[in-house]
Every structure is written in C-alpha cells, then in structure tokens.
Amino acid sequence: IVKATPLQDRMRQERRLANQFKSPFKGLPKEVSVLTAISFLVAVGFGLIIPAIPIFAKTFGVSNTLIGLIISSFAIMRFVSGLFSGKLVDRFGERVVLGFGLFMVSIFTLLAGLAQSYEQLLIFRTAGGLGSSMFSVSAGALILRVVADNQRGRAQSLYNGGFIAGGVAGPAFGGALIALSPRAPFFIYSALLIAAGTVSMIYLHESRLGARVESQQEYFLLVGLGFVLYVCQMEQILWFDQC
C-alpha cells in the first residue's frame, strides 16, 4: 500500500471542503450570476443617492412637499412605465432593453447630479425611472426565459439577494460621499450603471437564450408596484431622519 504524501492529503482535504461548500450558482445558467452581479452594482449605486436626494434638493430652496416629489417621482415613473417596458422587451429582446435601460439611467443620473435648478432635477430623476423600469422588466424576463421551471425560485432569490446586499452597502458609502458634496453620489451611481451596462452587453448573449415565455406584463406590473413601496419606505425613513 502506497502511503499518501502530505501534499496529497492536503489536496484531498481541499477537494472535500470544495464539495461541501458548493457555489449557490452551481447548475444555473451563467446569465443568473451575471444578472446578480448587475443587480448588486445597481443597488449599491441606488443606495448611494438615497441619503443625498433630500439634502441636494434642499439646496434649491424648495419646500418639503417639492422635495417629497423628487423622492417619489423616480418610483412613480418606474411603476407607470412597467407595461411599456414589457412591450419593449417583447419587441427588441431582453439584452438590448436591459443594456439600454442601464445606460439611460446612467445618463439621467449624471444630468441630475449636474442639475442647476429644481425643475431640472425633477425632470432628470423622473426620466431615470423609465430606464430603471426597462432594466428590471428585462432582467425578470431574462430569468424566466433562461432558467428551468424547477430552478426559478433559486435563481430569483439569488438575483434579489444581490439587490438587497447592494442596498445594504450603498447608503453607508452614500453618507460618507455627502460630506464631500451632495452631487458626488450621483456621479458615482452613474459610473456604476455604466459598468453594469457594459457587463450586460458583454456577457449576456441573445444566441444562448431559449424560447421566450409568454408575455408576463401583469407580473412586471406587480414587481413595479413592489419596488415603488420599497423605495418609498426607504426614502421616507431617510427623509424624516433629515428633517
């Protein structure tokens, strides 16, 4: 009997440990891990600007009511444009709409950070909600399309987990950036969205996608409503903390 060397024993132990701690993405299409990474980047950036919005809006000398409108305009536009975004996905495909939506939010977030008046900030924040709707609807459609029925729950939980993790990390860094300038979080968020959009265009390929599922516009409408409630709850908490 040949006795194993210490190196061989260590390699066997490493293999056993690797088998015990399997990746949660194991067995899922590559698109799921890519979408999870994208959702994390988006959520980090979104969390960056949440504490900055009320402070930035105050610099224009407007009332609390108008500041509240800035806070809610993004979520409202995201909600009302859900069905329109679903039609875009049906016509142009998930990857195109997802990438275009991310770049659209990036541009309008940058413009919001450069806003010189309350009206400009309101318009740019509202327009960004349309791009955000395009991203979320196309990402949801892509998961439905590439993941088998018996794996969709796990895929959706990983995707949502990426967003939640980013949402937890973002506000902490956003608070630090405000000390530099209330505009700074907008610029960082815009850069993160460009990175996320680039990742989507590189790693999500239409040629690998399966047949499309039937239109899920009602589902996307409910997702949009859930996002509105989530955003309003988070931003109201932060807004009242600023009062």
Please tell me what each predicted stretch does.
Residues 4, 201-213:
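Helix-loop junctions on the cytosolic side of multi-pass membrane transporters
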Residues 50, 228-243:
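Extracytoplasmic gate region of multi-pass secondary transporters
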Residues 57-58, 88-89, 173-179:
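Interfacial helix-cap and linker-helix signal at transmembrane-aqueous boundaries
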Residues 75-83, 167-168:
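Residue-level signature of mid-helix packing/kink "hotspots" within the transmembrane helices
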Residues 80-116:
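Conserved MFS/SLC helix-loop-helix module at the cytosolic interface between two early adjacent transmembrane helices
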Residues 108, 119-127:
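Paired small-residue
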Residues 124-163:
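Cytoplasmic helix-loop-helix junction between adjacent transmembrane helices
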Residues 159-201:
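Helix-loop-helix hairpin linking two adjacent transmembrane segments in secondary transporters
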